């Protein structure tokens, strides 16, 4: 079994290609004033705004702290997601999507990369042509997300031959039509898509599946400032080590990355290798 610290050292020497949509996340921090007398809405007072590089750019920010060489294929389309956020408790009130045109992504040359990492946010980047090209990758990891812009129409089942798949619980349930049953029931069907499967469970940690075996790992923190990007951090780090890692090490390192990101508002900063090692030592 390769130690967790050695896994991070292995990742540092890899050449990775990160593919996915480029998203700009904008937070407008507001102070709620109350309900106007004539309208069924809530009035707010704008305090300030903050802009972050999200989507594949945020994932790359985490990966660059660990991996020696990281390239990006983002298709050229910029998506803006503006959120109005109650400033005192960082509670999001509503969100607006803005897509500035659409460019069909070019299929990247995947030769020469140790790992190809796909962040599929369901906004059109992962075309069938792109998916058909993935078997040419030496090792392919994918995170297939469900959000308000694609609910029910961006399922992991559109992929067929991944090495590593990482989704959250709602995404796993949608992909396997498992509304009320145990989440464990979703793992074998997802195991037909990828050799290694991880389902993140929020405050309940994460569960992994490989070769018919199920592994669970509890979450590492109860402190959550902002959940945005925690799953991306989990995936960005674990995608770099999934090939060599045993399942428990994969889950522990992912949970450490997610715990660190959950304490950061938006994408203000990436998680560092030093922070990741310190978190793993703290929970050992």
Language-model features, listed with the residues they occupy:
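Short basic (Lys/Arg) and small-residue
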Residues: 231
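Flexible, glycine-rich loop/tail regions that form catalytic "lids" or insertion modules at the edges
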Residues: 237-238
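Ribokinase/PfkB-type carbohydrate-kinase core domain
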Residues: 1-40, 44-227, 242-256, 263-284
């Amino acid at each position: 079994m390769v130690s967790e610290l050695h896994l991070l050292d292995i990742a540092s020497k890899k050449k990775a290609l990160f593919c996915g949509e480029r998203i700009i996340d904008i937070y407008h921090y507001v102070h709620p004033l109350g309900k106007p007398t004539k309208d069924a809405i809530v009035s707010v007072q704008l305090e300030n705004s903050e802009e972050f590089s999200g989507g594949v750019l945020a994932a790359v920010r985490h990966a660059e702290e660990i991996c020696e060489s990281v390239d990006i294929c983002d298709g050229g389309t910029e998506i803006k997601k503006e959120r109005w956020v109650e400033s005192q408790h960082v509670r999001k009130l509503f969100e607006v999507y803005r897509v500035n045109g659409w460019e069909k992504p070019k299929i990247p040359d995947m030769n020469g990369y140790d790992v190809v990492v796909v962040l599929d946010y369901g906004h059109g980047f992962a075309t069938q042509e792109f998916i058909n090209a993935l078997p040419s990758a030496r090792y392919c990891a994918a995170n297939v997300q469900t959000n308000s812009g694609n609910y029910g129409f961006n399922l992991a089942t559109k992929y067929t031959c991944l090495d590593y798949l990482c989704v959250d619980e709602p995404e796993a349930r949608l992909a396997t039509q498992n509304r009320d049953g145990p989440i464990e029931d979703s793992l074998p069907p997802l195991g037909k898509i990828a050799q290694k499967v991880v389902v993140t469970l929020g405050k309940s940690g994460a569960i992994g599946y490989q070769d018919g075996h199920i592994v669970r790992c509890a979450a590492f923190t109860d402190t959550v400032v902002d959940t945005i990007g925690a799953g991306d951090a989990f995936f960005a780090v674990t995608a770099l080590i999934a090939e060599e890692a045993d399942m428990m090490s994969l889950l522990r390192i992912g949970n450490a990355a997610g715990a660190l990101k959950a304490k950061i508002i938006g994408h203000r900063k990436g998680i560092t290798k030093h922070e990741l090692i310190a978190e793993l030592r703290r929970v050992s």
